[in-house]
Amino acid sequence: PGTLRLDTPAGLVIAEYKQVGEHVEEVRITNVPSFLYAEGLTVECPVLGEISVDVAYGGNFYAIVDPQKNYRDMADHSANDLVAWSPVVRQRLNEKYSFAHPENPGINRLSHMLWTGAPTHPEADARNAVFYGDKAIDRSPCGTGTSARMAQLHAKGKLKEGDNFVHESIISSLFKGRVEKE
């Protein structure tokens, strides 16, 4: 086993890896502290109309879109739909609300969208599509996104310290997370 200490814009991230021969088989990452920042923020989304989002931090600020009246599940929409809507929704949220990390004033805007849905993989607890940048959907469940999602679920009493959480991506890849401490 080995350990890497990564100095990221969000803070120190520790990566512990298990190597077998010349290949790394498993990596465990201890992320920066994550937290639910805001609940129930409303915004107009193209095509869908008004939606409500929670905003959580897991290394970046995420607008998390859970099932609701105008949005049932990410499976109902194409990746192209999410790529088209996400920058508009993100911009509108940044114009309407303020986002500021309590310990790092340089982190002061919502940068990612996390669209949720029911898992399709038998081992997964939840599924997501993470939009970032100008027009990209992450193929992985996203480490900072998984941390933000877990912080949201923990704050709402759906995960507690020590609970495991398996997050599925838009292409069914999996990340395993655990609430380490409150």
Regions from the PLM with identified roles:
Residues 1-144, 148-182:
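Active-site proximal loop and beta-alpha junction motif in alpha/beta enzyme cores
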